[in-house]
Amino acid sequence: MQSSKNKIIEIVMLITLTAVFSNTFQGMSYAKNLRVAVIKSFASTPFEETLSGFKESLKKEEIEADFEIFSANGDPIKVREAVQQIKSGDFSLVFTMGSLATDNALTEITNIPIVSSMILKDDKIKKTPNATGVVLEFSIETQLKCMQQILPKGITIGTIYNSKENGKFVETAAAIAKSMGYKFYAKEINTPQDLPSALESMANSVDVLWGIPDSMVLTPETSKHILLFSLRNRIPFIGLSSAWTKAGALYSLERNYNDIGIQCAELALSLLRNQKERATNPVPPRKALYSINFKTAQQLKIEIPENIINGAIQVY
């Protein structure tokens, strides 16, 4: 009798284990044979480095991926055509690069997992259950920690913003800055014409001017005015990229685009293996590099530690 019970238990366990391993390997089999549609908004070195990291990461995971590349070169019509082809095709995954490609794909493609890259904001991705991605904007914590390494602690940070675009960001940044021992002064503008007076209000109020992505504040037309204000008032300006650093910003955070591609691949595999669940929220880049303008530091009489200068990817 006991022997009969043991046999029944063994059979039940065998059936259970078979089902578990069957489901596991079915998921792995699906993830290891992918047909990937890539929509590139533009052709540039950062886009190529990101795509290279994405491909390399999948290959390292022994994923057999067949890529079909749709290059839009900034043409909205080409993007729409690509999206329609993808919708009627048999694709496992869509990898979008740039806002032009991402916005169209998020609107039109609802039944295929989407991973997005080369975009600044994540608002639209958060509202799309089948999508995730890596945004270009660093987390507030990352930006302020970098500031701590380069500039004195306890300083007053100033920023200028348009509330429609960055109201929520500034509110969050103010709270985080305060928790890290900074004073925070933000000035809202409603038109580009408000910028000169906003800058002047900061002349005797802040120790550093923090540039945040804002289409009203930071433009090719306003850049000269902002950088001249920085030098004349000896208030360092923190830029958005090496182009800003080269033009006169004290420093800017830079991205490792290859690693962003690797991050996207990791998100893609997670998304594919958990398709019944909502996609995870988009994430910022995990690696922060930086460029420094040593000449600007000298003009502003700011001492930059030698290890910080040596760690920069570019020194001007």
Task: Label each residue range with its predicted role.
Residues 15-23:
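Hydrophobic core
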